[in-house]
Amino acid sequence: MAAGSWKATRLLLAILVALVAFSYQVKRKTFIRIEEVSALESSVKETLEYVTDEYNKKSEDLYNFRILRILKIMKQVTGHLEYHITVEMQRTTCLKTETSLCDIQKGELHKKIQCYFSVYAIPWVEVFKILKKNCTDIS
């Protein structure tokens, strides 16, 4: 009998701790919503430009890459915006020192990658930061 009541007490204590921890997390990050959004949204365009520029700055490749296809964009609204972006990017004919719109690389230098970016964004004050980046070769 005592063992049964001890198990019940431990279970109630575990539930109480879980509820307190959950309420603390809710207060810490006010989660409002997450939704799929269009690339035509103005803040999304700015975020995609930022992601492309940052990728090219940090890449060790001699050539710039550009977004070829947008696979998915999710917007998470909390105290700020967070975009979760999945894109296909392809190597261009422009070296890193060139900034004009360039053709896609063909032949031996052809390279296509799929990238996932998680981006912290406050677009109305032009603040962006890549929180996570994962790119893999797809060709």
Curated annotation (Swiss-Prot):
Disulfide pairs?
Answer: 94-102, 115-135
Record-level Gene Ontology MF annotations: cysteine-type endopeptidase inhibitor activity
Pfam families named among the record's database cross-references: Cystatin (PF00031)
- UniProt feature coiled coil, ranges: none
What the record says about the induction of its expression is:
Up-regulated by testicular factors. However, does not seem to be directly regulated by androgens or estrogen.
A GO BP term here is: defense response to Gram-negative bacterium
Q: Supply the CDD domains for this chain.
A: CY
Positions of glycan attachment: 134
Q: Does the keyword Glycoprotein apply?
A: yes
A GO cellular-component term linked to this record: cytoplasm
Keyword set, alphabetical order: Disulfide bond, Glycoprotein, Protease inhibitor, Secreted, Signal, Thiol protease inhibitor
Compartments reported by the entry: Secreted
State the SUPFAM superfamilies in the record: Cystatin/monellin
Q: Which tissues does it occur in? A: Expressed in epididymis, where it localizes to the proximal caput and also part of the midcaput. Not detected in other tissues tested.
Can the keyword rRNA-binding be found in this entry's annotation? no
Segment forming the signal sequence: 1-28
Describe the family membership recorded for this protein in Swiss-Prot or TrEMBL: Belongs to the cystatin family.
Q: What does this protein do?
A: Has antibacterial activity against the Gram-negative bacteria E.coli. May play a role in sperm maturation and fertilization.
Protein known as = Cystatin-11
